[in-house]
């Protein structure tokens, strides 16, 4: 189900009971839900209002019961114990705690850090979902990190807006578990995070820190800030000695106000921030920073406070973790990011072969991401190994870098670079609001995209130039962290 206080209660109740949590992302299809429930051998399924009307319990033969999250009613029970417990819940609670539930009844077991806490099934961009086994030590390692890097900058009791899905590790750990343990007041966003909806929520909640994925921040900046801040007049004023500083400060405060006016920093993760947006925010002195991680590390691998942030990077190695780049010259030649430490998973549930493929004999987890690292230890992601393409002369092409440039061009909302034979083609979903506002027809749009292609190719080495831009009428399908599901489009025409 979607984020809610009841989802949070079910999560915490499961952990404190001593059972294993299996979060299911609300974007998953019913078939994916059945596969996860059956593969994980789950005994109890909590469902939100949307999922409740679409699932068929017969497809999950080993489940013992289904609980409706909005009111915790039992939709289906297959055991007498569950039926009795729900019907006599108050009576059983009163019998166990005759003088009410008090502080001394709370007991935390801290002697089993290797015990399994969660199995989190990846959404992935390959279409194959694996169950990531995360022990309690991995949750603690990330919590301890967040207490250290964020806790010292915000006050307990301050407000935080929960935008990201809690079924995803980034949203769960960084936007819920940390804030809950630190004593923040969490407001769950229950609607789709459009720029308007998010801006309204920011204005009401005034969060002490903003935690987001790039797409949300990029849309807010492009829709709410760029129309006034990127005019020729303002750009000229920003470059003028003396007055330029004041103009930048005013724009920075405007951006801060759009995000509630109270945030220590804006922490972005899940993918790289568009370079145009990042450069703009850094130019005006806005407190933006990036982190990097994976489901398999629950999730953090690198992070830096905005005061230590380097443009284009995703931070330095976090505490409790060793991180390195497998390259003979990591400052200049990209290599795979590998890491080890207490954040790393046990492995993939019921999939030893997949586990052995990513965790080597020395305990290093191979992320599948390519990066360089500067002399100060800041990491710069180049792309995924599996996404890397070969250019016309056999050179490596990193599609994410081309997409980042293309996404800043006229009428482009999002893009995907694919290979067709020995040629590179861009699939582009246009910014339809902007197209409609300008009154452009299909022919106009094609002409604009052709100009974009020529302008982009002028910036690219010859082996990574685009042969064509094809217009995609609908938004690309995405994972929970808003990464495009590339596998769906590799062979699409």
Where are these regions (language model features)?
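Adenylate-forming
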Residues: 344, 378-407, 434-444, 460-466, ...
């Amino acid at each position: 189900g979607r984020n809610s206080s009841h989802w949070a209660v079910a999560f915490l109740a499961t952990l404190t009971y001593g059972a294993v949590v299996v979060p299911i992302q609300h974007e998953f299809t019913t078939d994916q839900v059945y596969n996860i429930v059956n593969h994980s051998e789950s005994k109890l399924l909590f469902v939100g209002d949307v999922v409740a009307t679409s699932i068929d319990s017969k497809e999950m033969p080993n489940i013992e019961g289904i609980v409706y999250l909005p009111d915790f009613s039992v939709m289906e029970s297959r055991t007498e114990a569950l039926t009795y417990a729900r019907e006599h819940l108050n009576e059983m609670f009163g019998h166990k705690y005759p003088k009410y539930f008090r502080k001394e009844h709370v007991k935390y077991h801290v002697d089993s850090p290797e015990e399994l806490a969660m199995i989190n099934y990846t959404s992935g961009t390959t279409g194959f979902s694996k169950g990531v086994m995360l022990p309690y030590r991995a949750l603690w390692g990330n919590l301890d990190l967040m207490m250290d890097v964020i806790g010292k900058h915000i006050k307990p009791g301050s407000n935080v807006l929960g935008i990201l899905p809690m079924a995803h590790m980034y949203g769960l750990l960084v936007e819920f578990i940390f804030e809950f343990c630190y004593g923040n007041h969490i407001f769950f966003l229950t609607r789709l995070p459009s720029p308007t909806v998010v801006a309204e929520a920011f204005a009401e909640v005034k969060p002490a820190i903003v935690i987001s994925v790039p797409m949300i921040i990029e849309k807010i900046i492009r829709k709410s800030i760029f129309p006034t801040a990127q005019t020729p007049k303002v750009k000229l004023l920003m470059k003028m000695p003396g007055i330029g500083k004041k103009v930048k400060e005013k724009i920075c405060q405007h951006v801060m106000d759009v995000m509630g006016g109270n945030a220590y920093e804006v922490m972005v993760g899940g993918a790289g921030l568009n370079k145009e947006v990042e450069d703009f925010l850094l130019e005006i002195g806005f407190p933006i920073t990036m982190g990097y991680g994976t489901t398999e590390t629950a999730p953090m691998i690198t992070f830096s406070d905005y005061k230590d942030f380097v443009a284009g990077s995703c931070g330095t190695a976090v505490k409790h973790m060793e991180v390195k780049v497998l390259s003979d010259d990591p400052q200049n030649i990209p290599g795979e990011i590998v890491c080890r430490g207490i954040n790393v998973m046990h492995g993939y549930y019921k999939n030893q072969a997949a586990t052995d493929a990513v965790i080597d004999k020395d305990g290093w987890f191979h992320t599948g991401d390519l990066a360089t690292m500067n002399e100060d230890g800041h990491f710069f992601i180049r792309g995924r190994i599996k996404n890397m393409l070969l250019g016309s002369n056999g050179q490596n092409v990193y599609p994410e870098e081309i997409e980042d440039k293309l996404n800043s061009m006229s009428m482009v909302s999002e893009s995907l670079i694919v290979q067709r034979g020995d040629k590179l083609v861009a699939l582009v979903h246009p910014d339809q609001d902007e197209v409609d506002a300008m009154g452009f027809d299909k022919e106009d749009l094609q002409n604009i995209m052709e100009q974009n292609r020529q302008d982009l190719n002028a910036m690219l080495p010859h082996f990574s130039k685009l042969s064509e831009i094809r217009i995609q009428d609908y938004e690309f399908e995405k994972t929970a962290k808003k990464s495009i599901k590339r596998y769906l489009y590799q062979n699409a025409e």
